[in-house]
Amino acid sequence: MRSLLVLLALAACASAQYFFRGGDDDNGFFGGDDDNGYFGYFPRFSYPIYRPIYRPIYYPQIIRPFYGYGYGGFNGGYGGLGLYGGYGGFGGYGYRPFSYGYNPFSYGYYGFGDDDGGFDD
């Protein structure tokens, strides 16, 4: 019974990180990658168990790859190392609809809108 409770606690922690950690690294390729705190590239806004069935109408990935916009979320962190040696940049600030920066590529400088260093690729 205790091991079952431990497993449930670990699952709860993992799912909380899944929703609230600042999102996916783009390896410095797109400067406007999002942090998946509020609006994600794919809808993490929905719970994982519903994801095969439920999809929100709003799909920012249609727009973002061309313009490098990053959708700000709850807690964007510093970006990881970019593919070409630049840092990814910041995730997002609070509930801002867009992270800072129109920056399709991040070569050696901060491309605002990137995220948590690829921990959650």
Curated annotation (Swiss-Prot):
* Sites of Pyrrolidone carboxylic acid modification: 17
Biological process terms in GO annotation: shell calcification
Q: Where is this region: 4 X 4 AA approximate tandem repeats of P-I-Y-R?
A: 48-63
Q: Which UniProt keywords apply?
A: Calcium, Pyrrolidone carboxylic acid, Repeat, Signal
First and last residue of the signal peptide = 1-16
Q: Which domain of life is it from?
A: Eukaryota
Q: Does the keyword Repeat apply?
A: yes
The portions of this protein that span the membrane are: none
Summarize tissue expression.
Answer: Expressed only at the mantle edge where it is found predominantly in the inner side of the outer mantle fold.
Which GO molecular function entries does the Swiss-Prot or TrEMBL record give?
calcium ion binding
**sequence repeat segments:** 48-51, 52-55, 56-59, 60-63
Instruction: Relate the protein's function as given in its record.
Output: Displays inhibitory activity against calcium carbonate precipitation, binds calcium and affects crystallization of calcium carbonate in vitro. May be involved in calcification of the prismatic layer of the shell.
The protein's name in its UniProt record: Prismalin-14
Q: What organism is this sequence from?
A: Pinctada fucata
